[in-house]
Amino acid sequence: MGENAQQYNETTEQPLQRLIFTCDEVAEMLDKTGADNERKKLLAQIENKLSTIARQGRAFGIHLILATQRPDATIIPGQIRNNMDFRVCGRADSVLSQIILDNTNATEQIPKDARGRFITGDGIVFQGYLFDEGQL
């Protein structure tokens, strides 16, 4: 939780709860390709709010988890991308790895046949767990 929220929680009987906003395929939410003017205005408002949360949210205990197949500058604006503290990438070519992690580690450290394997911006490689639907 952000420093300001922690300080607030130490001085009140009703602490702020963490809020986590998760969006899988954020590209679907922000892509302006082929959008008419009305839709572009709506998307600009959404982008503006996400940008504000990315910049200031941690101080209030609000966190973003945004996922997309290809987070290029046309989909996730730099203002949002630069304020995302933690990045994770699966197997990717060097261009995509550079976009996500600012390095080519996803290309170099994740084998092509490794399914469910990811690397963090700090270079930590980890394996995701495969859930069998019968187990759920």
What are these regions (language model features)?
Residues 18, 34-37, 49-52, 63, ...:
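N-terminal, helix-rich and Lys/Arg-enriched segments in bacterial and organellar proteins
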Residues 1-3, 39, 43, 52-56, ...:
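Switch/coupling sub-region of P-loop NTPases
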Residues 1-20:
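Mechanochemical coupling/switch segment within NTP-driven translocation systems
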Residues 24-26:
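Walker B catalytic acidic pair
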Residues 28-47:
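Flexible beta-alpha connector loops of hexameric P-loop NTPases
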Residues 54, 60-136:
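Conserved ATP-driven motor cores of ASCE-family P-loop NTPases powering translocation/secretion/packaging/pilus
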Residues 1, 5, 30-33, 61, ...:
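Alpha-helix capping/termination and helix-coil
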